[in-house]
Amino acid sequence: MSNPKVFFDMAIAGNPAGRIVMELYADTTPRTAENFRALCTGEKGVGRSGKPLHYKGSTFHRVIPNFMCQGGDFTAGNGTGAESIYGAKFADENFIKRHTGPGILSMANAGAGTNGSQFFICTEKTEWLDGKHVVFGKVIEGMNVVRDIEKVGSGSGKTSRPVTIADCGQLS
């Protein structure tokens, strides 16, 4: 079975910015990949928070140039919230894959075993995150869109313009 491919159709300041296509490593991180895939399709309905378990309409709330672009907080929208398809949080699956360079897709967390829905896309090699954050996919198309998102970031992570996932889903 091949790894699933999902997409984000991005908007910057309300304007279409292009599509990011990601391959999810279901072969090495099946639970983490399934969580992200289902949050892209929205197929699990409404979560415990009362919000849809869906990335559509959520933002990239933290973007740091030459580091990463972080999103996935569809409960609070500011980096304080997150919910997985398994409940509030789930354990680190494994650290087989590494943060080897631009385009790596990894889970954001607040310490061991605190994965929810927040994720980040690396814009550089970030080896200091190995063993702390679960790598579960990579960008296979649209890295130029990630670079455009990176341009509205700052050292603090605050974006100069809103970066939104206008639509998302599964391709294969």
UniProtKB/Swiss-Prot annotation:
Keywords: Cytoplasm, Isomerase, Rotamase
GO cellular component terms given for this protein: cytoplasm
Pfam families: Pro_isomerase (PF00160)
Location(s), subcellular: Cytoplasm
InterPro entries: Cyclophilin-like_dom_sf, Cyclophilin-type_PPIase, Cyclophilin-type_PPIase_CS, Cyclophilin-type_PPIase_dom
The keyword Disulfide bond appears for this protein: no
Keyword Cytoplasm included in the entry's annotation: yes
An example Gene Ontology molecular-function term: peptidyl-prolyl cis-trans isomerase activity
Highest rank taxon of the organism: Eukaryota
Tissue: Expressed in meristematic tissues, with higher levels in nodules.
Regulation: Binds cyclosporin A (CsA). CsA mediates some of its effects via an inhibitory action on PPIase.
Principal location listed in the UniProt entry: cytoplasm
The protein's Enzyme Commission number: 5.2.1.8
Enzymatic reactions: [protein]-peptidylproline (omega=180) = [protein]-peptidylproline (omega=0)
Single GO BP term: protein folding
PROSITE patterns: CSA_PPIASE_1 (PS00170), CSA_PPIASE_2 (PS50072)
Domain PPIase cyclophilin-type stretches: 7-170
Family membership noted in the UniProt record: Belongs to the cyclophilin-type PPIase family.
Function: PPIases accelerate the folding of proteins. It catalyzes the cis-trans isomerization of proline imidic peptide bonds in oligopeptides.
Protein name per Swiss-Prot or TrEMBL: Peptidyl-prolyl cis-trans isomerase
Organism: Lupinus luteus (European yellow lupine)
